[in-house]
Regions:
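N-terminal amphipathic/basic leader segments beginning at the initiator methionine
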Residues: 1-20
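Glycine-rich loop at the start of a catalytic domain that most often binds anionic cofactors/ligands
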Residues: 66-75, 93
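Glycine/threonine-rich beta-strand-loop-alpha-helix active-site module
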Residues: 76-91, 95-98, 111, 116
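PLP-dependent aminotransferase-class I/II
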Residues: 98-144, 148-156
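A generic structural signal for well-ordered alpha-helical segments
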Residues: 160-161
Length: 162
């Protein structure tokens, strides 16, 4: 099978995924009250150790930007690489879904940010109400260049964010 890494809006689904979707296609309660949604909520609750609810969305853009909107106020900022997916491929969706949050662009090799490059971007921001203050850090996994963050790299960014 030839692999093509299209947008989630244009790519075809793998035959195994399609078969699973067809097997799950049965009448049920809608609006998150169905059996599959409850099973997914239970699986996430077990994984995170507290009650969690999954939000089903149709596209990756909606998933990315709704997640940002849940974390970042309209007056806040999201630190990301200047070639991060949310900067280069989501159009104006991050600002739209967050009602105005700004992307704070950091540098880094092959579209990967590090604690050092994040701190460099943050060092350009003055404290106070006249500049957007950071509220989240976003990484693209894998990057637009196909590079992957290691668990240690993600942990180092998480430590900085904490």
């Amino acid at each position: 099978m030839r692999m093509k890494f299209f947008s989630d809006n244009a790519a075809t689904v793998h035959p195994h995924v399609w078969a699973a979707m067809q097997a799950a296609d049965a009448p049920d309660t809608g609006y998150d009250g169905d059996t599959l949604s409850r099973r997914l909520d239970d699986a996430f609750s077990d994984l995170f150790g507290k009650r969690a609810t999954a939000l089903w969305v149709a596209t990756g853009t909606a998933a990315n930007c709704l997640a940002l909107a849940a974390m970042v106020p309209p007056w806040g900022g999201v630190v990301c690489h200047r070639e991060a997916h949310i900067e280069t491929d989501e159009g104006g969706a991050p600002g739209f879904y967050t009602h105005g949050a700004k992307l704070i662009l950091a540098e880094g090799d092959a579209a990967k940010i590090t604690p050092a490059t994040i701190n460099a971007a943050l060092g350009l921001i003055r404290a106070g109400v006249h500049q957007v203050q950071p509220h989240a850090i976003s990484i693209t996994q894998s990057t637009e260049y196909g590079r992957v963050y290691t668990p240690g790299e993600v942990a180092a960014i998480e430590t900085l964010a904490s």
